[in-house]
Amino acid sequence: MLQSLIKKVWIPMKPYYTQAYQEIWVGTGLMAYIVYKIRSADKRSKALKASSAAPAHGHH
């Protein structure tokens, strides 16, 4: 369903998008990557804090 919709839109628009919007696609990709990295790092730090919280309370 979604793939056929993408093909219907993408194929006629492809030359236009690849030329005119190449920079925008790169920017969008970078933004998505940065957001993903921040979110995964945030999850990791929260997981670390959660796992190190219990022994840390015992020491203080």
UniProtKB/Swiss-Prot annotation:
<comment type="similarity">
    <text>Belongs to the small mitochondrial proteolipid family.</text>
</comment>
<comment type="function">
    <text>Subunit j, of the mitochondrial membrane ATP synthase complex (F(1)F(0) ATP synthase or Complex V) that produces ATP from ADP in the presence of a proton gradient across the membrane which is generated by electron transport complexes of the respiratory chain. ATP synthase complex consist of a soluble F(1) head domain - the catalytic core - and a membrane F(1) domain - the membrane proton channel. These two domains are linked by a central stalk rotating inside the F(1) region and a stationary peripheral stalk.</text>
</comment>
<dbReference type="Pfam" id="PF08039">
    <property type="entry name" value="Mit_proteolip"/>
</dbReference>
<comment type="subunit">
    <text>Component of the ATP synthase complex composed at least of ATP5F1A/subunit alpha, ATP5F1B/subunit beta, ATP5MC1/subunit c (homooctomer), MT-ATP6/subunit a, MT-ATP8/subunit 8, ATP5ME/subunit e, ATP5MF/subunit f, ATP5MG/subunit g, ATP5MK/subunit k, ATP5MJ/subunit j, ATP5F1C/subunit gamma, ATP5F1D/subunit delta, ATP5F1E/subunit epsilon, ATP5PF/subunit F6, ATP5PB/subunit b, ATP5PD/subunit d, ATP5PO/subunit OSCP.</text>
</comment>
<feature type="transmembrane region" description="Helical">
    <location>
        <begin position="22"/>
        <end position="39"/>
    </location>
</feature>
<protein>
    <recommendedName>
        <fullName>ATP synthase F(0) complex subunit j, mitochondrial</fullName>
    </recommendedName>
</protein>
<keyword id="KW-0496">Mitochondrion</keyword>
<dbReference type="InterPro" id="IPR012574">
    <property type="entry name" value="ATP5MJ"/>
</dbReference>
<keyword id="KW-0472">Membrane</keyword>
<dbReference type="GO" id="GO:0045259">
    <property type="term" value="C:proton-transporting ATP synthase complex"/>
</dbReference>
<keyword id="KW-1133">Transmembrane helix</keyword>
<dbReference type="GO" id="GO:0031966">
    <property type="term" value="C:mitochondrial membrane"/>
</dbReference>
<keyword id="KW-0812">Transmembrane</keyword>
<dbReference type="GO" id="GO:0005739">
    <property type="term" value="C:mitochondrion"/>
</dbReference>
